[in-house]
Curated annotation (Swiss-Prot):
Pathway: Amino-acid biosynthesis; L-histidine biosynthesis; L-histidine from 5-phospho-alpha-D-ribose 1-diphosphate: step 1/9. Its main location: cytoplasm. It is found in: Cytoplasm. This is ATP phosphoribosyltransferase regulatory subunit. Keywords: Amino-acid biosynthesis, Cytoplasm, Histidine biosynthesis. The gene is hisZ. It comes from Picosynechococcus sp. (strain ATCC 27264 / PCC 7002 / PR-6) (Agmenellum quadruplicatum). Gene3D superfamilies: Bira Bifunctional Protein, Domain 2. Belongs to the class-II aminoacyl-tRNA synthetase family. HisZ subfamily. One of its GO terms (molecular function) is histidine-tRNA ligase activity. Transmembrane segments: none annotated.
Length: 404
C-alpha cells in the first residue's frame, strides 16, 4: 500500500497546484485590499478547542492522542482556531480585527463513505470585535468582490438568519422541533406533512418551509407572522442590511433570502450564508459563513463575549467551476532559459552563466541541462517545456544564444 496515499488523501500535481495558487493569490490580494492581515494558526489543536463548546460535531474531527493520552485533533475549520488566537494572543486589541487565511482543513467523511476526501483547502476572512449591519455588509461585499476577482459568474448568495430561524421554530412542541427543523432544512415537504402536528401547526410549518426567495418579498411575508420583539428587531435589521447593500455597490448582489438555512457548524448567532454556483448542470457550494457573537467567549480567559463574522471559500469547488475560465492558467509557466554545456568540462561555466541570468532578473526561470541528451533531444525538450531561450556554453564561458 505504500505506493498509494491513504483513503481520503490525494496528491496535487504541478498544474493543479499552479491553478489553485492563482485562485489563492487573487483572493489574498482582494482580502489585503480590504485591510485584512494574514494569520496562521496551528493545524493541531486541543479537541475541546475544535469542538467549540459542542457547536462542532466531534465525530467530524480527525483525532489524535498525545503520549499522556490527551485528546488532540486536526482542525475541521479555521474559525474556532482564529477565535482562540484572537482572544488569547490579541486580547488587548478590542477594536475591529481584520484577519485572513489560506490553509488546509481535515474532516472525517460521513459513515459509509470510505475513500471520500478528508483534506480540503480553504481561504477566508474573519472580522472580529465588530457588530452590526455595517460589519455584516462589509463581509458580504468583500465576498462578492472576491468572487468577481476570479471572474466567476452565475453564483448566488443564499442568506439566512440563525436567531430568526430558531425563533420561528419556537411554537413547535420540543419533541418534534428538531424533526421540523430537519425537514425544513432538507426541503422534505412530504416528511413535514406526515409529522403528528395539529392542522394549525402543520399549516404554519408549511409557511416556514416556503420562506425562500427575493429578500423584500420574504421579509414582507415573515413580517405578517406573530413575531416576538427580538424577531421583529431581526427583521428590521435585515431590511436595513439589504438597503445598505443595495446602495453600496453598482452591481447588485444576487441574494436569495432563505430563513430556513442551517449551517454545518452550530455556533452562528446572526446572518448565515452560502455561495452557490451552477456549472456543468451541477450546483457547487463555493463558500459559507456567518455571524458568531458568542464563539469568542468560549476561549476568552474571563469568558467575555465579543462579536465576529466571517466566511470561507472552498478552493476545490472554485477550481472545478473555473476550469473552463480563460483566466485560469492552462499550462505551467515554462523556464525562460536552458543553459547547456557544449563539452563536459564546461559545466562550471554553465552554473556561473545560469546564476548570472537569475541575478539579472529575479523573476526569470533558468534551467541547467544535466547532460546525457543529444542536441535533438534538448531541442525537443525545450519546445515541449515552452523554453524560449537556449544558451550553449563552451569551456571558455562564451555563450552561444538561440531563441526558439
Amino acid at each position: 500500500m505504500i505506493h498509494q496515499p491513504p483513503a481520503g488523501a490525494r496528491d496535487l500535481l504541478p498544474l493543479e497546484v499552479a491553478q489553485k495558487a492563482w485562485i489563492n493569490d487573487n483572493l489574498q490580494r482582494v482580502f489585503q485590499q480590504w485591510g485584512y492581515q494574514r494569520i496562521v494558526t496551528s493545524t493541531l489543536e486541543w479537541l475541546e478547542t475544535l469542538t467549540a463548546g459542542g457547536a462542532v460535531d466531534r465525530t467530524k474531527v480527525i483525532q489524535l492522542q498525545t503520549a499522556e493520552s490527551q485528546a488532540l485533533g486536526l482542525r475541521p475549520e479555521l474559525t474556532a482556531s482564529i477565535a482562540r488566537a484572537a482572544v488569547t494572543r490579541m486580547a488587548e486589541n478590542t477594536f475591529p480585527q481584520r484577519l485572513c487565511y489560506r490553509a488546509n482543513v481535515f474532516r472525517h467523511p460521513p459513515r459509509g463513505s470510505h475513500g471520500k476526501q478528508m483534506e480540503f483547502y480553504q481561504a477566508g476572512v474573519e472580522l472580529l470585535f465588530a457588530a452590526g449591519i455595517v460589519a455584516d455588509a462589509e463581509i458580504l461585499l468583500l465576498l462578492a468582490d472576491s468572487l468577481d476577482a476570479l471572474g466567476l459568474e452565475d453564483w448566488q448568495l443564499i442568506l439566512g438568519e440563525a436567531a430568526l430561524g430558531r425563533s420561528l421554530l419556537d411554537p413547535f412542541p420540543e419533541p418534534v422541533r428538531e424533526t421540523v427543523r430537519h425537514c425544513v432544512a432538507n426541503l422534505d415537504r412530504v416528511g413535514l406533512q406526515e409529522l403528528p402536528l395539529d392542522e394549525d401547526l402543520k399549516a404554519y410549518a408549511l409557511d416556514i418551509f416556503d420562506l425562500r426567495g427575493e429578500p423584500e418579498t420574504i421579509l414582507a411575508r415573515v413580517s405578517q407572522f406573530d413575531l416576538g420583539p427580538e424577531a421583529q428587531e431581526i427583521v428590521a435589521n435585515l431590511k436595513a442590511l439589504f438597503a445598505l447593500l443595495a446602495g453600496s455597490t453598482q452591481k447588485q448582489l444576487p441574494i436569495i433570502l432563505d430563513l430556513t438555512l442551517i449551517q454545518t457548524f452550530d455556533y452562528y448567532t446572526g446572518i448565515v450564508f452560502e455561495v452557490v454556483n451552477f456549472a456543468n448542470h451541477q450546483s457547487y457550494i463555493l463558500g459559507q459563513g456567518g455571524r458568531y457573537d458568542q464563539l469568542l467567549g468560549l476561549y476568552h480567559p474571563q469568558r467575555e463575549n465579543h462579536p465576529g463574522i466571517g466566511f470561507c471559500l472552498n478552493i476545490e469547488e472554485l477550481h472545478t467551476c473555473l476550469l473552463t475560465s480563460p483566466q485560469l492558467p492552462k499550462q505551467l509557466a515554462g523556464s525562460a532559459w536552458l543553459v547547456i554545456a557544449t563539452e563536459p568540462n564546461a559545466q562550471q561555466q554553465v552554473f556561473h552563466y545560469a546564476q548570472t541570468l537569475r541575478q539579472g532578473d529575479e523573476m526569470v526561470r533558468v534551467e541547467v541541462e544535466l547532460g546525457g541528451r543529444s542536441p535533438a533531444e534538448i531541442y525537443a525538450y525545450a519546445r515541449s517545456s515552452h523554453i524560449t531561450h537556449l544558451a550553449w556554453i563552451d569551456p571558455s564561458g562564451e555563450p552561444k544564444l538561440e531563441t526558439l
